[in-house]
């Protein structure tokens, strides 16, 4: 893709997201979603082959269906309230339709089937954009409509998403699919807290984006797409491989890493609201996520593949790419736990 075209496409993606985030009018939000969706499809198809074509088609069909459902919900709401304002949702059916549309856009269960398939079919760079930037717009709308959302529906979706995110990743050897299932689980945690403390959802989203960006950037250094290629990285980049493994444990929510903060805070907030069973179930199902990350760490770090001695010297001569953004991203993705007392300002 030529640089001017790429710049225009990226600018359109950003503009679409910004329109959604800054609008309080349903029509503008819908236009922002459409701009964002149509601009991201060429990014997904950057490396043109049947796999990317299939992934882009799946993405388009899902997002178009979600946009249609959203507009349907908006129209029903308009019929009953006579207003296009986001905060005024007076009809329960409209609220449910909007929630379902946004869960489809986010890839929450039971509308999650497109996420692993699309992520697996595209390049690492496109996957990184899909699992980070593309979550911001739907989450911002969910944040705005959170007072009108059906609590039981969203808690059910959140619980099932955390379960599916953990269960789906258990048998995977493809790193992109593992990241996709991890994304489903993280979105589930965010959906669970959004009604009770929307500000905490933003904290969770920021930490999730930081951890996912760092992990994808490290995968891109060596074009690692499978657990086997990750274990081969020990010979080329021993330090980077060990950082990837720490980041993965952070994504799994292992204390004392940054990924533990949102889980801890969400469980605390839900129990404050007299909810005991749901946070308990979510904490138990989160162990599935941690298990497959631990298994990946074990298979990569502790079971070394046979290699010749000259291979072990390879890292000294390897010309590494420039990684200016990586050090601050890695630090924030792993070492933020001591700053947790500062979160008291959220209350």
Swiss-Prot record:
Reactions catalysed? a ubiquinone + NADH + 5 H(+)(in) = a ubiquinol + NAD(+) + 4 H(+)(out)
Q: How does it sit in the membrane?
A: Multi-pass membrane protein
Assigned GO CC terms? mitochondrial inner membrane
The membrane-spanning stretches of this chain are: 3-23, 25-45, 66-86, 96-116, 122-142, 149-169, 178-198, 201-221, 237-257, 274-294, 323-343
Presence of the UniProt keyword DNA damage in the record: no
> Which Pfam families did the record assign?
NADH_dehy_S2_C (PF06444), Proton_antipo_M (PF00361)
Q: Please cite one Gene Ontology biological process associated with this protein.
A: mitochondrial electron transport, NADH to ubiquinone
Q: Does the keyword Membrane apply?
A: yes
E.C. number(s) listed in UniProt: 7.1.1.2
Role according to the record: Core subunit of the mitochondrial membrane respiratory chain NADH dehydrogenase (Complex I) which catalyzes electron transfer from NADH through the respiratory chain, using ubiquinone as an electron acceptor. Essential for the catalytic activity and assembly of complex I.
What does the similarity note say?
Answer: Belongs to the complex I subunit 2 family.
Name of the protein this chain belongs to: NADH-ubiquinone oxidoreductase chain 2
Tell me what gene encodes this.
MT-ND2
